[in-house]
């Protein structure tokens, strides 16, 4: 296991959030310390969420159809609730 300067700093500062520690204390390192920068970049890349490079159009279309269906059901239900509550709201 390689221990970096930032690991030591975070341990001494009792930093529990590793990503926050690298973000804050990483700026303390000299800019020309390429080994430390490379180690930090490697560790930070472990926190980055993996993103798909491409999404098939049929997947997008399927999700859009589902979203449209949910929106349609929402509008119908909203109309039902408004119709049901409307007489109750205008009572004196």
UniProtKB/Swiss-Prot annotation:
Belongs to the 'phage' integrase family. Keywords: DNA integration, DNA recombination, Viral genome integration, Virus entry into host cell. The keyword Metal-binding does not apply. This is Putative protein IntG. It comes from Escherichia coli (strain K12). GO terms for biological process: DNA integration; DNA recombination; establishment of integrated proviral latency; symbiont entry into host cell; viral genome integration into host DNA. The keyword Translocase does not apply.
């Amino acid at each position: 296991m390689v221990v970096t300067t930032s690991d030591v700093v975070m341990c001494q500062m009792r930093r529990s959030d590793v990503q926050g520690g690298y973000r804050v204390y990483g700026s303390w390192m000299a800019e020309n310390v390429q080994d430390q920068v490379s180690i930090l970049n490697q560790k930070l890349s472990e926190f980055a969420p993996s993103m798909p490079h491409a999404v098939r159009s049929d997947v997008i279309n399927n999700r859009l159809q589902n979203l449209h269906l949910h929106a349609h059901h929402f509008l119908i239900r909203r109309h039902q609730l408004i119709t049901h509550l409307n007489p109750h709201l205008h009572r004196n």
